[in-house]
Amino acid sequence: MTMDALEAMYTTRAMRRIKTDPIPELVQKKILDAAIRAPSGGNTQGWRFLLVDDSGVKADLAPIYRKCMDSLWSTIYKPRIDAAEANPEDPESIEFMKLVRSASYLGDHFEDYPLILFGFSQFDTSGGSIFPAIWNAMLAARVEGVGSALTSVFQFRLDEMNEVLGVPEKGGWKFSACVTFGYPTGRWGVAPRRPAHEVSYRNSWDGELGFEIPEPLWSME
């Protein structure tokens, strides 16, 4: 299967509502092979990728993930949730609560995702190598019609997650992100974002960019 590079980049957005159909081994190979083609600082390749498709392992991870989500909602996102609930008719509140429901769906159905990837890095404190690799994996999945969703919420309970996955205590391997994969039940689309000119500068911070991009330069049409 082939796909225009821009289509893959523009339409690889979080796809959390998925089917439980297994991901073929060939597709899994393409996901991992694409991941390791990403830039690697000093070509150290200080990354490890752990695939989980065993129902027992997923069942052990699911309650940990849900506890992590509870921690997320009650700490980092609590002010935004409170603000949205206080003003539910505001367009920003409506959009934010849609995100909350979507993220909660992933937690409620964590064990149902047919394939889950865990990315680990070694001495990559900036994430400059591991996250391009994870993004490559997600792009490769998109080309094969497989949806993905990235989360790092396991950071709240790393010891429990590491114990389930058998991550060694020595070696300096640190959890970076978790990505769920599955064939989506919904349609692909371009993720809504603030226009690039609202978050970009030229030559200095707050420097005038010189142009605007009011609409995505690629569309499904």
Go through each PLM region and give its residues.
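Small-aliphatic-rich amphipathic alpha-helix that forms the alpha element of a beta-alpha
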Residues: 34-36, 115-165
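Short catalytic-loop micro-motif centered on adjacent basic/acidic residues
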Residues: 17-18, 48, 147-152
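Generic N-terminal amphipathic, Lys/Arg-enriched alpha-helix
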Residues: 5-21
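Glycine/small-residue-rich phosphate/adenosyl-binding loop
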Residues: 45, 51-130
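A glycine-rich helix N-cap at a beta->alpha junction
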Residues: 70-85, 165-192
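C-terminal helix-cap and adjacent tail motif
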Residues: 8-11, 175-221
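Short amphipathic alpha-helical segments
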Residues: 28-33
